[in-house]
Design a protein with these regions (language model features):
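A short, N-terminal "cap"/entry segment at the start of jelly-roll beta-barrel domains
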Residues: 1-61, 81, 118-120, 184-186
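Short, surface-exposed beta-edge/turn micro-motifs
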Residues: 60-62, 87-89, 152
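Conserved short histidine dyad/triad with adjacent acidic residue
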Residues: 64-86, 106-107, 129-132, 140
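Glycine- and acidic-residue-biased ligand/ion/polar-headgroup-sensing regions
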Residues: 68-69, 86-108, 112-115
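Short hydrophobic/aromatic-rich beta-strand segments that constitute the beta-sheet cores
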Residues: 74-75, 98-102, 157
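Double-stranded beta-helix
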Residues: 107-123, 143-186
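Conserved metal-binding segment of the jelly-roll/cupin
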Residues: 125-149
Length: 186
């Protein structure tokens, strides 16, 4: 199911306020291009994210990822595409706490709260806790997922070219490119 225009506008407004309260300045064009991603699961409050993409060329990409309280970006990986390595990305926490999970030795007693009914779609549990100023680089084709802490979070993402619709999700119910931009200048 897709977000309604009203839900999309509300998420965009909340995203703008969250970014501005943290000292980020968005121009009108950036505000009009906010992407709201709910993955076709109709549960944006728990599984989804909001983002502003500044640039995405053949060589680089820069975005701000906004997650509200306990919002989760589901487990996925960035595969090889047409013989080229998948996306390599660096997450830098700007606000809040981010619980990032990657392949590796599982952490006992993780901080994240798995979305009820979707527990089986999370398989990697090596925890990296990012606080403002911390960063972590995720290599291509590495399974990962992340969740904001109690106060939400802002993550600056710096990466190679982003082709989000080619990401591979552990949860087969996910629609990779669902509700990114409902309508320009809404």
């Amino acid at each position: 199911m897709m977000l309604s225009i009203i839900e999309y506008k509300a998420a965009c407004k909340k995203t703008i306020i969250f970014l501005e309260e943290a000292g980020f300045i968005l121009n009108k064009d950036e505000k009009n291009r906010i992407q709201v991603v709910e993955y076709g699961l109709d549960n944006l409050e728990l599984i989804g994210l909001q983002l502003v993409e500044y640039i995405n060329t053949e060589r680089c990409c820069a975005k701000e990822l906004v997650l509200f309280r306990r919002q989760t970006c589901p487990e996925h990986r960035h595969p090889e595409i047409n013989g080229k390595l998948g996306k390599e990305e660096t997450f830098r926490c700007r606000k809040g706490i981010v619980y990032l999970y990657v392949e590796g030795i599982p952490t006992l007693n993780i901080h994240a709260k798995l979305p009820i009914g979707k527990e089986h779609t999370f398989t990697v549990f090596h925890e990296i806790v990012l606080k403002p100023g911390d960063q972590y680089t995720i290599m291509p084709n590495t399974r990962h997922w992340f969740q904001a802490g109690e106060d939400g979070a802002i993550i600056s993402e710096f990466s190679t070219k982003s082709i989000d619709e080619k990401d591979i999700y552990t949860d087969k119910e996910i629609i990779a490119d669902c509700n990114r931009i409902v309508e320009e200048n809404i």
